[in-house]
Curated annotation (Swiss-Prot):
HAMAP family: HrcA
Protein name: Heat-inducible transcription repressor HrcA
Similarity remark: Belongs to the HrcA family.
UniProt key word Transcription: yes
Keywords assigned by UniProt, alphabetized: Repressor, Stress response, Transcription, Transcription regulation
TM region(s), chain numbering: none
Organism: Staphylococcus epidermidis (strain ATCC 35984 / DSM 28319 / BCRC 17069 / CCUG 31568 / BM 3577 / RP62A)
Statement: the UniProt record of this protein carries the keyword Transcription: yes
A single GO BP: negative regulation of DNA-templated transcription
UniProt function note: Negative regulator of class I heat shock genes (grpE-dnaK-dnaJ and groELS operons). Prevents heat-shock induction of these operons.
Domain of life: Bacteria
GO molecular function per UniProt: DNA binding
Amino acid sequence: MITKRQLSILNAIVEDYVDFGQPIGSKTLIHRHHLDVSPATIRNEMKQLEEMHFIEKTHTSSGRVPSESGIRYYVNRLLEQTSHQSQNKIQRLNQLLIENHYDSSTALTNFAHELSMKSQYATLVVRPNHKQDVINDIHLIRANNHLIILVMVFSSGHVENIHFVSHAQLNNINLNKIANFLTEHFSFNRKVLTQNIESYFSQKEELLLANEVVEMINLQIGNQSNSIYMGGKVKLIDALNESNVSSIQPILQYIESNKITELLEDISTSQINVRIGKEIDDSLSDISIVTSQYHFDESLKGQIAVIGPTAMHYQNVIQLLNRIW
């Protein structure tokens, strides 16, 4: 069982290591934190922390650095403390959507870069899966005698366009009729939607085109992976350069692979989650990922991740993500 003094020393070692990136000795701790105890007492407490596997020796110094277990203990305490704090939530994404005329891709790109600037680490923002999204509007526009453009507008502000060839002899009145019906009645329950279409459309070409449009919408949404927007990749590279150059390539490969998508898709709560080193992947030991959710609206949510070295300013990052609605 860790004592109050040992916890204070562990906190000091973690925070000093984050700030200075150097092993910490007993005299340094006393000097920086104005501890009213002898170096011998500090050394004894550090020995106890080492036996608990919370701190460890390095090959190049007589000082100690926090281990993954020590950082995990420190982070768990932080999460416990912040879970009881009420925060004034900031609806920054809503502001960015308005500023960018509801162009959600631009808004999310700017959101990722803003979070990176505030946290000073790399950030990932994942667009909500369209299967969670609601189609607000469907439009059918005839481009020429054979080409029709299908436009889908989602509640998140995202817009999808599909160009397709159709030889149906339908004018704009017919196309608007189909589009308006689908806007009002579209459902992922295919059986119910098909029944509604068949009971509503008496003209064969309207019926065929309506079913064709539904097929295209389902195919388009089903094939889409969640878009990921990254901000501050260079900040991650710079941070890793200072600690372990050899770890940069596997970390970047992980971030750019499906593994990071799978990790983020597992987030189902707005609570802050922190994964450290090999908790993320057996091949990783130098980064931490702090994740949470953000809101497009009351029901539609996406994921946020802040990625940095294991010697991360966790308190700043957790407070930042706690304030995002």
